[in-house]
Amino acid sequence: MIRYLLSKLLLIEAILLLVPVSVATYYRESSQVFIALFSTIGILVLLGGLGVLQKPKNQRIYAKEGVLIVALCWILWSFFGGLPFVFSGQIPSVIDAFFEISSGFTTTGATILNDVSVLSRSLLFWRSFTHLIGGMGVLVFALAIMDNAKNSHLEVMKAEVPGPVFGKVVSKLKNTAQILYLLYLGLFSLFVVIYYLAGMPLFDSFVIAMGTAGTGGFTVYNDGIAHYGSSLITYLVSFGVLVFGVNFNLYYFLMLRRVKAFFGDEELRAYVIIVLVSTSLITLNTLHLYQGVSKSFEMALFQVSNIITTTGFGYGDITNWPLFSQFILLFLMGIGGSAGSTAGGLKVIRGLILTKIAKNQILSILSPHRVLTLHVNKTVIDKDTQHKILKYFAIYMMIILSLIFIVSLDSNDFLVVTSAVFSCFNNIGPILGTTSSFAIFSPISKILLSFAMIAGRLEIYPILLLFMKRTWSKR
C-alpha cells in the first residue's frame, strides 16, 4: 500500500508541474526550461505509472504506514520538485535544488540564491506554488482530490497536520480535507485580488499571495516586499500572514456562525496578545531608527507577523536593530503560529499548555495535596496529553541544540547559526545576522537543514521514525 500510494502521489506532482509549463508557455521561455520541466514530468510519470500497475489487495493504512507515507512523500516531492532547476541549469547543484524546494514545500522560504532574478518566470512561479501546495499539507491536498480517500487515511493526516491534536471538522475525512482546502484556496484567491488592487503586478500578486497563504516567504525580488515601496502593501502582507497563522477550524466555526467558539479560543487570544506585545516592545525599542512612530510600528508589525507565522517575507536590513528587538524575533521563531494553521514552529497551543503545566507544578509545591487540573478552552487536558507535549518539547530542544552544534562548524557567528537552525526547523526562512542566504553553508549542512525543514513541518516524529529499524520491520 505504501508503494501504491507514493506512486499515485508522484503522478499528482507530475500533474502539478503542468502549472509552471503553462507559465513558461505564456512568457515564451527558452526550450531549455521546457526540456527541464517535461523531463521531470516524464520521470515522475514513469516511476508513478510503474508503481500503480498492481493495486494492493489490502488497502488498510495503519499508523506505521501513515507515518512512512508522509515522510517519504515529502522527501520524494522535494527531490523531484527540485529537478527542473537542475536540468535547466538555473540551480546546477542537486543539493541546492533539494534545499530550495524542501524550503518551498515546507513553506520555510529559506533560499540558497543570492539573486532570484537568475530564475525564469516559470520556475519562480513553481518555487512559490510549492508554498501553496505545502501550506495545508501535501497529503491533505492529495486526499482532497483522490476519489478513493477513506477514513483509514486518517492516519496519514494525523502524521502530517501540524499541531498536538488533529480532529475532523465533519464526519467524513474526504469532506474535512475538501472543506479545509476550499477555505484555504478561497482566502488565497481573496489576497490575490487584494494585492493586485493595492498596486502589485498580476504575476507578483499571485506569487506573494501563495507565499502569504502558505506562510512561506518566497518573493519575486531580492529586496522582498520593500521593492514595492508601499506602506499599504506592507500592512496588507502583515495582516495576510496573520490571517493564515490562525487555526483553520476556527474559520469553519465562523462560517457556521459559531462566533463565541471563534473569539473564545484561548490559543487565538494568546496569539493576538503575543503579536500586540511583541510589536509594541519592538516599536518602542526601534523608535530612534525610523522617522516617527508610524514607520517604526509598520516595520515592527511586519517583522513580528512574518516571524510568528513563520512566513519570513524579507523587508530591509534588521541587523542594525537593537539586540533586544532581535532576541524578541528569535523568541517568536520558537513559538510559531496556531495549531491547524499553515504556520510552522512549536505552536502557540503547546506554549500555552507548557506555561500552564509550569504554573501547576509551582502550585503543587505550595499545596502538595491539592488536585490540579489543566484546562484549555474549557476542556481538560489529561496527563497523557501533557506528558506527550513535554516529551515533544524535550525532543524539539535536543534536535535544536544538536543542529546548532553541527552547523556551527560552518560559521563562527552565533546569531547566524542559531537563527539558521531555528529558521529551518521552525519553517521560518530568514537568518538574523550578516547574511540572508543559506549559500554560505556546506553541502552537509544544507542536507541537514533540508531534513530539519521537513522534520519541523511534519512535527519531528515521521522523519525520526525513518531511521528506526522497527519502522521497517514487517511485524
Whereabouts are the PLM-identified features?
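Membrane-proximal intracellular helices of multi-pass ion channels
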Residues: 1-475
